């Protein structure tokens, strides 16, 4: 049956990557198998030969080319990582050879990791290799794969990934490699006779850790760390053994403040583990300041418990280990020392587990479940040394679990990835496992249980923490001889007592699974939620650990059985999680006391996501307890040990509209339907698990779309967990701060918004209510056909079917564990004409009569009544129905089609439902749009439907990047937008993911808002028609897609362009080239959010439609760029002086500066911020963003036009801090005026000449001697001529340009000692303090200043890029704190934090700094007596100023003065003073990026060539194929310089003024291309083929270096 998982759509497959399965926790075992499309692992066309597409022949496969790809000729411009073979047999194959060809920047710290094929986290490598220090872009290494615990299956799919060492960016990935291991064990199904084999070679170890201390931890910039320990027990990495309840135990130590040598005194931690487990200790920095500026990771230690046992056996109690790294690029230092003591050992010889299939009787009072309930309500005890002694052999004897009248079986729910047939085998106590179910266990466990220690003690030892798998046993019904009433009352009491504690403990728990009993049958459900961990152990160690723990007579299969039965016979297996020691204060709680406030009682499942800690797993109050608990007589529920309680019949449910619902305490018509709802694997590592919480709807299950995999039990609550998944889609939004929503990925419903409720009159047991109750809970009589297509979708009924009425008859058999992927029971009777079945937010089916516009809970028959609805006898109830359906119209929604995964189920919203004031047209529109989702997301039909919805004018309008520009131009609409929180929320949701438009398209506020932009004077688009309904309301018919809508299609932005009156606001946005592993372009070009979205979303489609057009810069992007100016606070305070006192608003601006669009979106509803930004409307609109300074990968063209440079070579990163000035026209005017004044004052005009005769091999020394020999006046006035020795070329500016290019490369080269790189990750340079040791260094800096001046007055560009403070020094401007951002970002952030926060009693600083000179650290005072002057809140401003001055000027004051003096010996200071630092940077250095469009548009042709000539087309195709570095070399080859003037290629200069780039037809086809740098001309022979042209051009560009004279 696993084969059917292959049909699951690729969109959501990545959501399952973090799921661990009960059958085996390792990522490469059966539970981690993926049936994925091979295309998912393809990267470019030339790699397909390495892939086997569905086992077919290796024939050619084509994939659609992205229209954003700059290389439309070949794929060679993309980074690649190739592997020599796609198959590898361990021990038989030759070693793999990994080839890399990286187009982006490379680093000596780059590394290649080996990963499982579905691994997405870079730290979870199986193995890695550093690629060496040669720094080449191409190379290869040999990789030998040994048999290890990674490859425990006959076949394992892996891949290799290349990561950049500095940034951690993924550069390239290989296709998949299949590793075959012939020695891998083959798992088989188990029989009863296997359960008693080999049970004597396992033991559980109880041990304690104490006396922790660390030495030499990593120190931050200003602050010593505040370290604490995070200790956990995890299954052995890639272990063949299963995840068990003790896995995931976690402890946290206290925080030791401000030290690199912490000692944790009087702290002892107790754990229970197997020898094969791994003890993980992570050292982290608490850093409780308001703005974290350092990495919190200080190091980690992963140690097999077996290693500690071996050390213990030889007498070593205190052990010490060096801390390790998560990634090869992590900087970790220090050691960790601790004491390891064994406190007790549970030997299997003492704990033989009876696996007899003969039933034994026992009293329920003696069961561990009862003991658990008795002690479950108490507070978890604090850790004590004696607690570890509670694990004693005599306390864990043989036991018996009560057996009911029928057979008793324990069923482990299957992992999400495995859908095996599981059937109960009757009286034999056997459970048959489907053929695909390797690793799954189903066995009867019947044993006597002796008195056990309290649940708190055991829960303390088996603390199921953040990464735990939880196997909680709940006490269900008593045996036949036991009364159930006292137990029910006890459960109710315990539920109330434990409620508060449970809420606190749910924050970081994994999926809590329950064992529930109904009709004498136990059902054990296991789930594993464990983060994948990096492999920090050598392969040999893991093999040793497994070998030392395995005995010969015992197989992993029988070990699984014995260990599992041992653990789950112990009361500790039923213990909940002890309270987290530290997390409660750190993590955000989204639901604190709602359960007490609303009286909602039932907590069913905890499904915590690390990024979205969800505590709101409760039942909607609409589900009356009397009827909402199928599978439990009397509706009672036992409580969890940690207080996850149920209320039972004695605690009435309260809610928005359930007050009038009578209790049906004795009604058990749905009894036995299904008894659990939590998913076996609810955790998804790659998706936000959205939830809703309100006073009127609480879900009892995980809402993540990945939770439902077609193999769960239906819910014992009002609705199944499958149905409840729709709540996350059907909730409206709250008026609370969007930041909460962004942080927790929750959708909240305000209390005033009531969820739709059931008809109160119908709660009479056997009426239509019972009809709906049965449906979500699934059905007993289920055929195996449902197994055929397990899907990751929310639906588990077939369309058009209705529930079976149970008529109050209890069912004696629970449904077998099998996939359910349809929402409707199996009734094939069609609905009458004009009727439609829909599902509300609680998963209940209701029926819509489109003729009478009414709805009903009862399924209509062919002889339906004319009015189509059984009317209520009460006017009040009818009004309630009307109010509810008005709410439904706004709140109801359907699941996305991707979650349906081929089930073709229809889930539709009652958009025009009865009572809601809707119309037929509205309902038809809803039907039309929602029909798009009946087919699978990847089917051709569905693609066509999505395309139709894509054409929706409203979608185009809202998702257009210029939406906010149009919004700000419409004053009335802008006022509506800013005053409506709900409207903002809807707009942001749709902009974030256009598929959300389906949810909101009939919202009245949204429709009215969009229609405010419609121009009614225009004609309707082709295929549209306007009509009027019975109420006189206009609606629009789209005959193209056969849909109706109330939204006027005559809204702007339909062609991707702004209206004419707004075109002046367009500012073209640079597009960035993307390599493997980076975010999608869709996410970047969407105006409101930078979150990546699925590639086939509507926005992506819109994006691809208009890819060829120049996309305008979104308004939000302009705001972010405007706020990121260095001097922004001074600018803001000029117009709003109160900003200086408003620290909250300043912090918000800082947040936007740091987080970008994501932060702006969160704060978009902040009134103060909106008012402040409104004062700068014009400045924001006219601002050309400073993108490159904050996004080093962005490429800037001279005209800010869209250009995608396919790769950014290392040389181009030097331009990362350069950008156009804020007011481009102003700067252009300054530049023209500057050159005009230079010419008027005679600078560089002659008649005298400066003749420089240069030898290429002595360029620097020869130039120094000649330039320094000229006087100041000669340098200013004379013309410049450059001649290279031995080269007869005349200098009509070509040689001069090359001279400055070559000279700047040497003079400003950091390796010559005068200058240094400003930071490790940028190529901007600054004056080096070490230059003081260079002989005659001040004269060299004076010479450097003269060269800068000569280049400026003769209008040549330098190939050197300096920091912003350097240009300020040239202009003799003072530096401020903002300038450090370009110099040292981390240093700037640290000082900025000091400036913005109160540092009283936080920092222990004096007015001193530490300087390192040749390895020796010395202390220097920032002012006289600084060593004795403490930095306080009062004098911190002075400290910051002096630190900035020191950081900018440290050791370079004299050098800077000498350089500035030389600069002004050539240039008049009064002329240069018109520029600011950014503008001067552009005048001196230009921009190094190549805009191909600008280049081609400003190219001339001679000799018969023209732009359409075949050779010319080949030429530009070759240039497009070049990477950016090759393009720069081509430009240098033709023009003499690789720099481009600010004005673009149109401003290229020749010997006598402006001269465009020119290509002339010249020469024989055997000749190489020839260049005339004085005239910017390329002589290009008419080559007969593209390949010849490419080779010749590449040879000329890369090999030619001298001039010749014609």
UniProtKB/Swiss-Prot annotation:
Keywords: Coiled coil, Cytoplasm, Phosphoprotein, Repeat, Transferase, Ubl conjugation pathway. GO terms for molecular function: ubiquitin protein ligase activity. Residues 354-373, 651-663, 751-765, 806-815 have a biased composition (Polar residues). Residues 182-318 form the C2 domain. The modification Phosphoserine is found at residues 874, 937, 939. InterPro entries: C2_dom (IPR000008), C2_domain_sf (IPR035892), C2_HECW (IPR037795), E3_ubiq-protein_ligase (IPR050409), HECT_dom (IPR000569), Hect_E3_ubiquitin_ligase (IPR035983), HECW1_helix (IPR040524), HECW_N (IPR032348). The active site is at 1574 (glycyl thioester intermediate). Pfam families: C2, HECT, HECW1_helix, HECW_N, WW. Residues 349-418, 459-538, 566-672, 730-815, 894-938 are annotated as: Disordered. It catalyses: S-ubiquitinyl-[E2 ubiquitin-conjugating enzyme]-L-cysteine + [acceptor protein]-L-lysine = [E2 ubiquitin-conjugating enzyme]-L-cysteine + N(6)-ubiquitinyl-[acceptor protein]-L-lysine. Residues 500-511, 579-588, 612-621 have a biased composition (Acidic residues). One of its GO terms (cellular component) is cytoplasm. It comes from the Eukaryota. Residues 380-392, 589-600 have a biased composition (Basic and acidic residues). This is E3 ubiquitin-protein ligase HECW1. It comes from Homo sapiens (Human). The lineage of its organism: Eukaryota, Metazoa, Chordata, Craniata, Vertebrata.
